Every structure is written in structure tokens, then in C-alpha cells.
């Protein structure tokens, strides 16, 4: 998040250059995609041990933690960078629309999943929504770029 915030001014200056903004994302994925997969993979592997530090009853939650890690990967790869890019190009309003749509979809999905699978259902819905929102951000950003003229 801090990198995206640091690059905000640079990306704002490039707001009418779709090629530069797409290249920014490729560079982001080359660096932070690899780092995200490696760090979240390490946490996945260490989940039972990390939770056992808090007591034996927490160790049972490793499957929930792992599900949240899958969702976090979606946030790291799509949701965060595209959300910041939308703000940088002056389209923070699109962030609001995507968040509203995801929120409205999450409510009925949780009402369905929690009675079926309990905490795993809630974790699954939240993890899926991080990926869905990231995909929506990417789609909305691409639509925005295609509407721009090339400088």
C-alpha cells in the first residue's frame, strides 16, 4: 500500500498515458506478485504453528487463516494496486461503485454461506470477494483506459 501511495504522484502525471499505466502494473506484478506469493506461501506453511502460539484451541483455525491468505493474495495482486491507480487517475468515484457492488453481493452470500459452513463459509465469502473486487477494479480500470485518448 505504501508503494502505491508513493507512486501516486507519478501515476497521476501519467493519467492520460494508458501504455505507461499498464507498464506500471506489469512492473508491480513482477516485483510484488513474486513477493506476495512467497510471503503468503510462507505464512500458509507456518499457519498452524503461528496460531498455536496463542493456545491449542487457536491451532484449529489454520484452515480459516489459510483461506484468508488466499483472499489476501487477490487483494495484493489486484485490489490494492488498481484501487490506487483509479484514485491516481481521478476516478475515485469508480472505487466507490465497485465497493458498493461488492458490499451488496457480500451480504446475501454471507447469509447463505455462514449457516452452511460456519466460519469457513464467512472466510470463503470474504476471500472470494477480495478476488472479485480486484477483478472488478482491473476491469473498470481497463475500461477507463480504453476511454482515454493516447498522448
Residue ranges: model-predicted function:
Residues 1-16, 82-88:
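Helix-loop junctions and terminal segments of transmembrane helices
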